[in-house]
A protein has these predicted regions:
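Solvent-exposed, conformationally flexible loop/turn segments
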Residues: 18-22, 75, 104
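Exposed beta-strand face motif in extracellular beta-rich ectodomains
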Residues: 76-80
Length: 107
């Protein structure tokens, strides 16, 4: 499986993101560069303007920044952004980060 490095210091692995599978998200963006002591993955499913099943997950500090893994619980779009313990946000300049979730079946 591939890994995707996307803008803002974010890496997702594996891609494509598949329903029922685990996806690992690494973050070394604005909050990490600003010295955040803790970073949380804020994620949900659905269209960009109406997330469902929204959750916050503490990320673990690594030598590459921060990292967390989630099990993909939906067949809808995965959306995410990041916040630190002081409630500062990195939402990719208002665009968030987003992946289409695949069924895992070949067409």
């Amino acid at each position: 499986m591939a890994r995707a490095e996307i803008e803002g210091g974010v890496i997702a692995h594996p891609v494509p993101v598949t329903a029922g599978a685990e996806v690992n998200i690494k973050y070394n963006g604005l909050l990490a560069a600003s010295g955040a002591d803790a970073v949380y993955l804020h994620y949900g499913y659905g269209p960009a303007d109406h997330w469902a099943d929204v959750a916050d997950l503490p990320m673990h500090r690594t030598s590459d920044g921060f990292e967390a893994s989630i099990k993909v619980k939906s067949n809808d779009r995965l959306n995410f952004c990041f916040k630190d313990s002081a409630n500062n946000w990195d939402n990719n300049s208002g665009k968030d980060w987003s992946y289409t979730i695949h069924s895992g079946r070949k067409p």
